[in-house]
């Protein structure tokens, strides 16, 4: 058996990735989120596949087909709510995974980090298109508002929006293509995940100390397989509590009303995991400026390797930057809250201050703090 595991071309890849992989002995539970994201992706693909068997991507029947899934299909309600809340769990794990990377300086693995950013954009695009499919009020108006942002692009904007819509408004053509893209993207994401892991295994994992761990590695199996299984069980427990007790807590009641182009909801807002970016978008009065700020709110992650000024990798032994990091986390919670609140005083002002703070902390304060900490430690080359 050992012979096959180590010599067979296919099993050898699996063995070198999940069994005999040398792993730092001191990685904490913050390193569990990679495997949890893998499980989330599998759950989403499987539940999505079964939903697609019963869903129809036509404006006249889409809403009814989702109702049919929930009422008439065996365990359809379970599949539907696992898919909807599975997306929320996916994003919780994603944000924690990215936060861990930012805290422990994992962005110094630039290839792995950049593929991760591409993955984040791909998952966000998939989630957005998935939200349009039930064809409720918030689906329709969310799609209208977000796709309309592309019209801010100079010269080609309007043409681009109409090209994406497949007409002069969000309609049947839009829904059909969004379903097609929503179906294919998770498989593209799976391919990107493999590339993400490929680059990670070139360098090996980071660890909480930020130091080289070559002298103290242990095999991935059984130590981290059992640790990952514990994480997976906890994830599934939280997911099933959400699905079975509070299935609609993260959704919008407006989406239980069929899409009506003649009636605009009082407050158009995306799902909770986009609210921080939506708040940044809304805090800038100019349309193009807002769109650029929206994109930069995620793309700024690509600048982290260049903004790293400290001689230490992580924030484990850097108290000043640690404080800034947790202020940034609190700031993101504030942005999430503002994104779901109406556009009126004082929310507009709070949103603008939080947006300015977000970029200032990352671009200005953290690099300065890194230099100050180096000087305080008198670490000179």
From Swiss-Prot:
GO cellular component terms, semicolon-separated: mitochondrial inner membrane; respiratory chain complex III
Xref: InterPro entries: Cyt_b/b6_C, Cyt_b/b6_C_sf, Cyt_b/b6_N, Cytb/b6-like_sf, Cytochrome_b, Cytochrome_b_C_euk/bac, Cytochrome_b_N_euk/bac, Di-haem_cyt_TM
Assigned keywords, A-Z: Electron transport, Heme, Iron, Membrane, Metal-binding, Mitochondrion, Mitochondrion inner membrane, Respiratory chain, Transmembrane, Transmembrane helix, Transport, Ubiquinone
Binding site for heme b b566: 97, 196
Transmembrane regions listed in the UniProt entry: 33-53, 77-98, 113-133, 178-198, 226-246, 288-308, 320-340, 347-367
Topology versus the membrane: Multi-pass membrane protein
Residue numbers binding heme b b562: 83, 182
Cofactor note: Binds 2 heme b groups non-covalently.
S-S bridge residues: none
CDD domains per record: cytochrome_b_C, Cytochrome_b_N
Cofactor: heme b
Binding site for a ubiquinone: 201
Subcellular location(s) of the protein: Mitochondrion inner membrane
Functional description taken from the UniProt entry: Component of the ubiquinol-cytochrome c reductase complex (complex III or cytochrome b-c1 complex) that is part of the mitochondrial respiratory chain. The b-c1 complex mediates electron transfer from ubiquinol to cytochrome c. Contributes to the generation of a proton gradient across the mitochondrial membrane that is then used for ATP synthesis.
Subunit structure: The cytochrome bc1 complex contains 11 subunits: 3 respiratory subunits (MT-CYB, CYC1 and UQCRFS1), 2 core proteins (UQCRC1 and UQCRC2) and 6 low-molecular weight proteins (UQCRH/QCR6, UQCRB/QCR7, UQCRQ/QCR8, UQCR10/QCR9, UQCR11/QCR10 and a cleavage product of UQCRFS1). This cytochrome bc1 complex then forms a dimer.
Protein name: Cytochrome b
Species for this entry: Peromyscus truei
């Amino acid at each position: 058996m050992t012979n096959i595991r180590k010599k067979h071309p296919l099993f050898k890849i699996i063995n070198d990735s999940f069994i005999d992989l040398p792993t730092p002995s001191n990685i904490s539970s913050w390193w569990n989120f990679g495997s949890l994201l893998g499980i989330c992706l599998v759950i989403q693909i499987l539940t999505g596949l079964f939903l697609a068997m019963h869903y129809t991507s036509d404006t006249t029947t889409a809403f009814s087909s989702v109702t049919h899934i929930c009422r008439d299909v065996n365990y359809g309600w379970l599949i539907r709510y696992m898919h909807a809340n599975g997306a929320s769990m996916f994003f919780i794990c994603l944000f924690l995974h990215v936060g861990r990377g930012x805290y422990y300086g994992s962005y110094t693995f630039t290839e792995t980090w950049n593929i991760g950013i591409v993955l984040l954009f791909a998952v966000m695009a998939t989630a957005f298109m998935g939200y349009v499919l039930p064809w409720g009020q918030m689906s329709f108006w969310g799609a209208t508002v977000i796709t309309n942002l592309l019209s801010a692009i100079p010269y080609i904007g309007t043409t681009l929006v109409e090209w994406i819509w497949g007409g002069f408004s969000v309609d049947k053509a839009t829904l059909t293509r969004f379903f097609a893209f929503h179906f294919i993207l998770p498989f593209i994401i799976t391919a990107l995940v493999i590339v993400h892991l490929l680059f990670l295994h070139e360098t090996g994992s980071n660890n909480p100390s930020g130091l080289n761990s070559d002298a103290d590695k242990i095999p991935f199996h059984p130590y981290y397989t059992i640790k990952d299984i514990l994480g997976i069980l906890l994830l599934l427990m939280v997911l099933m509590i959400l699905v079975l007790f509070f299935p609609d807590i993260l959704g919008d009641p407006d989406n239980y009303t069929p899409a009506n182009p003649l009636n605009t909801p009082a407050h158009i807002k995306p799902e909770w995991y986009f609210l921080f970016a939506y708040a940044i978008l809304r805090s800038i009065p100019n349309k193009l400026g807002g769109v650029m700020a929206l994109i930069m709110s995620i793309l700024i992650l690509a600048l982290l390797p260049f903004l790293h000024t400290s001689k230490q990798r992580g924030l484990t032994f850097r108290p000043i930057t640690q404080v800034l990091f947790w202020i940034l986390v609190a700031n993101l919670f504030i942005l999430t809250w503002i994104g779901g609140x109406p556009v009126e005083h004082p929310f507009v002002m709070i949103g603008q201050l939080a947006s300015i703070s977000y970029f200032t902390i990352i671009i200005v304060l953290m690099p300065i703090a890194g230099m100050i900490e180096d000087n305080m430690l008198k670490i000179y080359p």
